[in-house]
A protein has these predicted regions:
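Negatively charged, low-complexity tracts enriched in Asp/Glu with abundant Ser/Thr
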Residues: 1-42
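Short, contiguous, helix-prone interaction/anchoring segments in small proteins
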Residues: 33-57
Length: 88
């Protein structure tokens, strides 16, 4: 997988939660100096002072890892799928 299909602009994604209301998450690409995106910062979407939800980091193969402790595995997977589609 190449980095070309990853999300390149700030976007919002709706995540479904198992035992709580869903939430909209703001996804912000973190560009490297060479223009490649390797990480995405995650925040609550509509608050004046948004809460930081962690980050998702990608390698050149399209594998990802979540760096944070707020999102469940299912929620992480929803955000990662959204990013991998490259749509926003």
């Amino acid at each position: 997988m190449t980095n070309n299909s990853l999300l390149l602009t700030e976007s919002k994604v709706w995540i479904k939660r198992k035992d709580a209301p869903g939430e909209v998450v703001r996804v912000i690409p973190d560009m490297e100096s060479n223009g490649r995106v390797t990480a995405y910062q995650l925040y609550t979407a509509f608050e004046q002072n948004p809460d930081y939800l962690g980050q998702i980091l990608f390698d050149n193969e399209g594998y990802w890892i979540y760096d944070g402790d707020i999102l469940t595995v299912a929620e992480q997977e929803q955000v990662a799928r959204f990013i991998l589609k490259g749509e926003g």
